[in-house]
C-alpha cells in the first residue's frame, strides 16, 4: 500500500508485509506540528513459505522496536510510540508520530488556502471511512477544511493469496513474542 507521509514505507520496509486495513488519524489542534496515529490492522506476510514469513515477522519486530528511525527523522517525523498487539484475532501495529509539517505534496498531501487534500497513491485501496469528503471526480482524493482539527480515514486493501497461509503464522509468532516479552 502506498499512502503518503512515507509512513507505510517505514512499516513495509521489507516489501512483503501487508495489512487488510489501515487507519490514519492526524490531530492538528492549532496546525503544525501534528500528531499522526497510524494503525495497520490484520498484518500478514505476502509470502507462503514459513521461513519467508519469519523474515517478514523479524522485519515487523525491527519496525516495532524502532531500529530504523533514520528514515522517519529524514522526513521530519519523531516517533512517540509503537504498539504491537492482537485484537480480535488480528495483528495490529499502531505507530504514533509528531509530524513537523503536513504539507508534503510529493506524498499526496497538499495544504491549500482553504482545504487540505490527500490523494491515495494505490489504486487498490478502497476508502471505507473518513471524516473528510471523497471527491466524486477522483475517488482516491479526500479533502478537509484547512482548519480541520482532525483528519481521519480508513482504507481496505484486497487480501492477497498468501493471506490464508501467512496470517495464522503471523498471529502465532506475535502472540509468542508478546508472551516472551512479558516474562
Task: Briefly describe each language-model feature range.
Residues 9-10, 63-70:
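N-terminal start-of-chain detector that recognizes signal peptides
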Amino acid at each position: 500500500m502506498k499512502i503518503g507521509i512515507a509512513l507505510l514505507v517505514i512499516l513495509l520496509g521489507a516489501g512483503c508485509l501487508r495489512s487488510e486495513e489501515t487507519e490514519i488519524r492526524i490531530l492538528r489542534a492549532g496546525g503544525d506540528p501534528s500528531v499522526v496515529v497510524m494503525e495497520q490492522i490484520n498484518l500478514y506476510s505476502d509470502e507462503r513459505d514459513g521461513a519467508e514469513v519469519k523474515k517478514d515477522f523479524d522485519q515487523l519486530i525491527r519496525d516495532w522496536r524502532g531500529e530504523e528511525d533514520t528514515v522517519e527523522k529524514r522526513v521530519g517525523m519523531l516517533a512517540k510510540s509503537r504498539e504491537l498487539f492482537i485484537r480480535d484475532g488480528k495483528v495490529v501495529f499502531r505507530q504514533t508520530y509528531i509530524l513537523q509539517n503536513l504539507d508534503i505534496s510529493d506524498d499526496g498531501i497538499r495544504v491549500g488556502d482553504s482545504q487540505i487534500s490527500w490523494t491515495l497513491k494505490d489504486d487498490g485501496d478502497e476508502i471505507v471511512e473518513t471524516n473528510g469528503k471523497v471527491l466524486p471526480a477522483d475517488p482516491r482524493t479526500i479533502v478537509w477544511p484547512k482548519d480541520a482539527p482532525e483528519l481521519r480515514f480508513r482504507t481496505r486493501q484486497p487480501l492477497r493469496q498468501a493471506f490464508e497461509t501467512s496470517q495464522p503464522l503471523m498471529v502465532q509468532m506475535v502472540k509468542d513474542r508478546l508472551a516472551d516479552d512479558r516474562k
